[in-house]
């Protein structure tokens, strides 16, 4: 793929007809690393008001030395990193004289080990034997050490100062391993964070889970320096406690003595779902607390669960678990009516009574938190910006991250400064927003917020035929309350320039998800020109998923759900927000960017694409990944169309295809559909494609960008051979740990003391040569604002820093659901909404999940074709913003 840009040659003709018949080619594999180079930074931005900031990046001073890289192969394999670290630590101490001397290696827990001085083994392979004391018997490991390479920190320093075009990955990896070695030994590592058991605090989440606090740490190349990004962190762990107590928490049993009967089927299923995959340790063998992983929970209680007991004469007899524990351990079970845990391999039939098992400490909860647990977590962890700043500074200055000075850093001559990095950012000007009506009022956001009072939509939709379906019980939502709600909605909608004419043509109560489809079919057949169904919901209910499945995919009807609490107690703000969503769904335009303030990219036809991939929760092999791409359909941009696909789930991806876990597999056809629709909507062919890609981690960026760029290019060529619009590919990242703080207290904004909306940083803590920037586009309401990170991976359109930063900030003001700027550009946000909506389209309506979380997988008889059909939007809806 050549780097010919639109700056050098305009190759697109506006008046050439798009041919909609040709197909797309298949995506390609990952790029050779020497072929794909992101564009260099085009210069620093200058637009906006300067603001003095602090960032939670700490300067790392590195010496101009070589570091020696060795491969470590430990047999037996597939041991936890914690065990591998113990093996290597023991090896370094045991073989100090002949091999390691005064070296204190940094080790990553897998295969990579680094030393400050070469080991006296040259390039030979060395085989060693290491013994660790075990429970009952010692464990012996065979360790093979092999020289890999010499890693130059001198080259890294040259890259940081701009004398080399590319930052050497091997040097960054070496530094990362060395700085993480000691905390990895002392704490519980989770990803790039470290946690320790609660001391002096206790934040239960319910369901056997609790909050653990810790810190995030990662080494990052920046302008002139390496930086250590340090942040406070929190996550959910399983509480170390008896399994009996764990079960009571999961099943909401206040006291185990209340559970006098065997578990019901629903109780057992719920308990199994929570405990499967967890490690437990036994308490009936004295000091030898053997650990097992739970694979199942038995249907029968311990008093009835049997297994074949081998007798001394070689024969086997059926024995219950309760009998066995009484005979073998003289242990009379207190709760023989409760089930057993099946542990180890399922085919081996190893059973343990609940009462002899404890949950092993230090197990992170990877399963999805419930809404209540998430709410509790947020309350426990939210910190205002000044509080978070103070906490991070205290953490670093007290050396409590690593429990004191780090001998491994000292070994390599590495020094971490303990002051946050000072830098100058800029606060970008907010765009003005054009409204409609007679007055054509203009709104100017203040700190990311503006008011719609006294303003009318730029293009409001007149609603003549509409219906109301109330799924809340009549005693909760009386007819007079419904009437009051519809009257107030009509008044607010008229004020907003989206008049709802007359009373609803249909207003009835209904019950349960099963009634949704027949009711909606009746409405479609009976009321010609029906534009909208307002659905009242009684809180969390599977009805929501069914409403969206039927409305979006089956019948092509616009639906707007409202929680009953907002009907019983209405507010102008809630009703106004409903109108924002309804107008967008029906094809209206709420507001537009004032044309004369828009960047120059708008001078030619341009399409804005947003893309995202959402994955099922870890360990859930039944649910597929979902890819979504949206595209703007006008020149404002305000209207968008969506495309969505079901992708092969992560569990089905082979080792060779790991690079494509995040790649949108059918991107070529998805972009092609959007380009055709853009042409139909505008009669123009876009000469520029601006692609905002969410959901990609830092390590995946280049691997994902190459096949996706090729797919976008192929989509264009499939429409016409010489159609080559300029592509700009930008990764949008929210999942990072960079935080910005105001140096001057007077510049803090809001109750949480955050940086102002529009704060932009493209120097000091950004990449030494590549085109990236941080932008905090929203006003923080709770906790510390997280700026979004933007990394430009391809740019045919030759954006300046100011142009792209301003464009991105303006797009954050075009999100239709609220009168606030949001944290990422609208197209990227919409792609997330589309992907999450598709999850509801896959929900099995027969399942009683209040959260709509049961998604049919292939094991439920739905093959890939059926899944693809389930997320296919009805032709009457597919060109609307049904996801708004």
From Swiss-Prot:
Record's GO cellular component terms: cytoplasm; cytoplasmic ribonucleoprotein granule; nucleus; P-body; RISC complex
Matching SUPFAM superfamilies: PAZ domain, Ribonuclease H-like
CDD domains in the record: PAZ_argonaute_like, Piwi_ago-like
Pfam families, sorted: ArgoL1 (PF08699), ArgoL2 (PF16488), ArgoMid (PF16487), ArgoN (PF16486), PAZ (PF02170), Piwi (PF02171)
Source domain of life: Eukaryota
Keyword terms of this UniProt record: Cytoplasm, Ribonucleoprotein, RNA-binding, RNA-mediated gene silencing, Translation regulation
Any one GO MF annotation of this record: RNA endonuclease activity
Domain PAZ positions: 242-361
Tagged with keyword Chaperone: no
SMART domains linked: DUF1785, PAZ, Piwi
Keyword S-adenosyl-L-methionine: no
GO biological process, one term: pre-miRNA processing
Domain Piwi span(s) in chain numbering: 532-843
Subcellular localization: Cytoplasm, P-body
Disordered: region residues: 848-870
Principal cellular location given in the protein's record: cytoplasm
Family indicated by similarity: Belongs to the argonaute family. Ago subfamily.
Function as written in the Swiss-Prot or TrEMBL entry: Required for RNA-mediated gene silencing (RNAi). Binds to short RNAs such as microRNAs (miRNAs) and represses the translation of mRNAs which are complementary to them. Lacks endonuclease activity and does not appear to cleave target mRNAs.
Protein name: Protein argonaute-4
């Amino acid at each position: 793929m050549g780097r010919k840009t639109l700056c050098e040659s305009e190759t697109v003709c506006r008046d050439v007809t798009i041919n909609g018949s040709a197909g797309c080619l298949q995506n390609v594999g990952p790029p050779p690393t020497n072929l794909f180079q992101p564009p260099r930074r085009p210069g620093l931005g200058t637009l906006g008001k300067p603001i003095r900031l602090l960032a939670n990046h700490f300067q790392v001073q590195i010496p101009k030395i070589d570091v020696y890289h060795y491969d470590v192969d430990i047999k037996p394999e597939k041991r936890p990193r914690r065990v591998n670290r113990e093996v290597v630590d023991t090896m370094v101490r045991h073989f100090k004289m002949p091999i390691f001397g005064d070296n204190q290696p940094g080790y990553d827990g897998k295969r990579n080990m680094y030393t400050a001085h070469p080991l006296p083994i040259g390039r030979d392979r060395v085989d060693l034997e290491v013994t660790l004391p075990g429970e009952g018997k010692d464990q012996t490991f065979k360790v093979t050490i092999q020289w890999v390479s010499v890693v130059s920190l001198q080259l890294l320093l040259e890259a940081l100062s701009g004398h080399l075009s590319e930052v050497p990955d091997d040097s960054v990896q070496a530094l990362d391993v060395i700085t993480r070695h000691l905390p990895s030994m002392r704490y519980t590592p989770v990803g790039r964070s470290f946690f320790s058991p609660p001391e002096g605090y206790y934040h239960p989440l319910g369901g056997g889970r609790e909050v653990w606090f810790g810190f995030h740490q990662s080494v990052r190349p920046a302008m002139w320096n390496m930086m250590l990004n340090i942040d406070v962190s929190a996550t959910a762990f399983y509480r170390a406690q008896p399994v009996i107590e764990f079960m009571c928490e999961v099943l909401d049993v206040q006291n185990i003595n209340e559970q006098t009967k065997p578990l019901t089927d629903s109780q057992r299923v719920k308990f199994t779902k929570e405990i499967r995959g967890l490690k437990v340790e036994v308490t009936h063998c004295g000091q030898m607390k053997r650990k097992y992983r739970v694979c199942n929970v038995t249907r029968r209680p311990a008093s009835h669960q049997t297994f074949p007991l081998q007798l001394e004469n070689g024969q086997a007899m059926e024995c219950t678990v309760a009998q066995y524990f009484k005979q073998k351990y003289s242990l009379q079970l207190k709760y023989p009516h409760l089930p057993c845990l099946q542990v180890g391999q399922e085919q081996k039939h190893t059973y343990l009574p609940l009462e002899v098992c404890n949950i092993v400490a230090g197990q992170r909860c990877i399963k999805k938190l419930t809404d209540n647990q998430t709410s509790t977590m947020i309350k426990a962890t939210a910190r205002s910006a000044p509080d978070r700043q103070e906490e991070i500074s205290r953490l670093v200055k007290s050396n409590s991250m690593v429990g004191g000075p780090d001998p491994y850093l000292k070994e390599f001559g590495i020094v971490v400064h303990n002051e946050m990095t000072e830098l100058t950012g800029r606060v970008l000007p907010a765009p003005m927003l054009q409204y409609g009506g007679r007055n054509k009022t203009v709104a100017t956001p203040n700190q990311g917020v503006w008011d719609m009072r006294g303003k009318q939509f730029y293009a409001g939709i007149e609603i003549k035929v509409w219906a109301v379906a109330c799924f809340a019980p009549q005693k909760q939502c009386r007819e007079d309350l419904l009437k009051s709600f519809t009257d107030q909605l009509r008044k607010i909608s008229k004020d907003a320039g989206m008049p709802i004419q007359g009373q609803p043509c249909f207003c009835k109560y209904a019950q349960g998800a099963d009634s949704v489809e027949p009711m909606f079919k009746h409405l479609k057949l009976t009321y010609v020109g029906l534009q909208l169904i307002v659905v009242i919901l009684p809180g969390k209910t599977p009805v929501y998923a069914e409403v969206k499945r039927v409305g979006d995919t089956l019948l092509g009807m616009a639906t707007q759900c409202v929680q009953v609490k907002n009907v019983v107690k209405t507010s102008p703000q809630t009703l106004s927000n409903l109108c924002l969503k309804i107008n967008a769904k029906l094809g209206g335009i709420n507001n537009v960017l004032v044309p004369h303030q828009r960047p120059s990219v708008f001078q030619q036809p341009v399409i804005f694409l947003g893309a995202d991939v959402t994955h099922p929760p870890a360990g859930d092999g039944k649910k597929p990944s979902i890819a979504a791409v949206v595209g703007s359909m006008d020149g404002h941009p305000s209207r968008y169309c969506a495309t969505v696909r079901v992708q092969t789930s992560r569990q089905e991806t082979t080792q060779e295809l790991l690079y494509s876990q995040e790649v949108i597999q059918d991107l070529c056809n998805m972009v092609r559909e959007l380009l055709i629709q853009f042409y139909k909507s505008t009669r123009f062919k876009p000469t520029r494609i601006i692609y905002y890609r969410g959901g990609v981690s830092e390590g995946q960026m280049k691997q994902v960008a190459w096949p996706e760029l090729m797919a976008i290019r192929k989509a264009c060529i499939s429409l016409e051979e010489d159609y080559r619009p300029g592509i700009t590919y930008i990764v949008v990242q929210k999942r990072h740990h960079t935080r910005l703080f105001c140096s001057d207290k007077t510049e803090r904004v809001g109750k949480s003391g955050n940086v102002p909306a529009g704060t932009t940083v493209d120097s000091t803590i950004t990449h030494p040569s590549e085109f990236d920037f941080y932008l905090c586009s929203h006003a923080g309401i709770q906790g510390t604002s997280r700026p979004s990170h933007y990394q430009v991976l391809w740019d045919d359109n030759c954006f300046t820093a100011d142009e792209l930063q301003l464009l991105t900030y303006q797009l954050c003001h075009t999100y239709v659901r609220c009168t606030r700027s949001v944290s990422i550009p609208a197209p990227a946000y919409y792609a997330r909404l589309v992907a999450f909506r598709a999850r509801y389209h896959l929900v099995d309506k027969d399942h009683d999940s209040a959260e709509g979380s049961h998604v049919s997988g292939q094991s439920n008889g739905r093959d890939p074709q059926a899944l693809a059909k389930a997320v296919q939007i009805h032709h009457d809806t597919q060109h609307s913003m049904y996801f708004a």
